[in-house]
């Protein structure tokens, strides 16, 4: 519940900043990167296995968000906006490590770490395929 509240707080912060800059939110659209990540793990299996798979995907999405926010925070000339992204980066890093910790807690660590590496390899292929298309997570 705490994570959900924190994420909603982030959404509000981003939305407020968008409005402050004179923009509006666009329509929600499907994220090809996320859809392709979800194709990696097979359907079925135990509830625990499916949960571990979802935790790994969520962890990867958070890790990539963290990387993007770090780059933005380091390159932006607007110090206020740079700090905004740095704060989000720290939070995303905590989420990423939390999801991996939970996956390792509920699944066999050796198997989870193997699946994590395989997911990273799969993601590299997704990134080659998607190229530099506009997206949130990809």
Labelled PLM ranges:
Residues 1-138:
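Non-heme di-metal
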């Amino acid at each position: 519940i705490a994570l959900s509240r924190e994420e909603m707080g982030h959404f509000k912060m981003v939305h407020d900043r968008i409005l402050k800059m004179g923009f509006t939110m666009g329509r929600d659209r499907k994220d090809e990167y996320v859809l392709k990540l979800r194709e990696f793990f097979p359907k079925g299996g135990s509830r625990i296995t499916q949960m571990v798979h979802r935790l790994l995907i969520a962890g990867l999405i958070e890790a990539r968000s963290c990387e993007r926010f770090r780059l933005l925070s380091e390159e932006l000339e607007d110090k206020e906006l740079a700090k905004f992204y740095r704060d989000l980066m720290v939070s995303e890093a905590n989420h990423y490590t939390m999801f991996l910790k939970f996956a390792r807690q509920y699944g066999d660590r050796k198997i989870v770490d193997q699946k994590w590496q395989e997911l990273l390899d799969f993601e590299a292929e997704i990134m080659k395929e998607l190229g530099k298309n506009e997206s949130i997570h990809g």
